[in-house]
């Protein structure tokens, strides 16, 4: 039986290509990595959004029943600490005025104060994510809120945090559009360099 050189080449080529592929399995902590990447993107958009909204608009709300932009900023700060506090052993150190001042008062703080506190809470969350891995996602943690406590998995806290940030980014993006400001996610993306 005669084997043609073409047949040998067709059979050998895929084997040689597979051998050249870098070995390795899935990335370490793929679930945590996905949540971290999504959350960091939302943080970036939220920071850009609040940076681009003029201070005069921080009292804006579309209807009397809705939250002001300033209220949303301070609320995000509180939520970031609430969720990210449960990602591991690291806990935030907050000044008494940050924990004892009523939300309605914090909502009227100057823009630079609110944005600085928001960015500090983002940094805390980034550091909290660094101590988290997939093996810890099933751990039970105690969530205490408004005087009530309940058990929840760390995965629930990570998912809750991502959903909360997406919800508030959507809210701020709508407020921005109502004020003729383009939200960060709608801005043209820079051109990628061609190779």
Which stretches of residues belong to each language-model region?
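Surface-exposed helix-capping loop/turn segments at secondary-structure junctions
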Residues: 52-60, 128-138, 177-184
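Well-ordered alpha-helical scaffold segments within catalytic/enzyme domains
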Residues: 45, 49-50, 84, 124, ...
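Short, contiguous alpha-helical
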Residues: 36-47, 59-100, 142-195
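N-terminal secretory signal peptides that target proteins for export/translocation
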Residues: 1-2
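Cleaved targeting-peptide boundary
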Residues: 20-28
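Bacterial N-terminal signal peptides
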Residues: 5-16
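Acidic/histidine-rich alpha-helical segments that form the ligand environment
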Residues: 105-143, 151-167
């Amino acid at each position: 039986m005669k084997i043609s050189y073409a047949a040998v080449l067709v059979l050998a080529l895929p084997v040689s290509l597979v051998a050249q592929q870098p070995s390795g399995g899935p990335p370490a902590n793929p679930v945590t990595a996905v949540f971290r990447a999504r959350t960091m993107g939302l943080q970036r958009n939220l920071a850009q959004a609040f940076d681009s909204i003029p201070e005069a608009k921080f009292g804006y709300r579309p209807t009397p029943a809705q939250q002001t932009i300033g209220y949303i900023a301070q609320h995000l700060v509180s939520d970031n600490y609430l969720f990210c506090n449960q990602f591991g052993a690291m806990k935030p150190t907050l000044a008494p005025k940050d924990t004892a001042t009523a939300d309605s008062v914090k909502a009227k703080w100057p823009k630079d104060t609110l944005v600085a506190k928001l960015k500090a809470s983002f940094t805390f969350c980034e550091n909290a994510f660094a101590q988290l891995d997939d093996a810890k996602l099933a751990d039970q943690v105690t969530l205490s809120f408004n005087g009530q406590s309940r058990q929840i998995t760390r995965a629930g806290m990570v998912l809750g945090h991502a959903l909360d940030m997406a919800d508030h980014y959507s809210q701020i993006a709508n407020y921005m559009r109502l004020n003729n400001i383009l939200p960060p996610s709608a801005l043209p993306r820079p051109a990628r360099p061609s190779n």
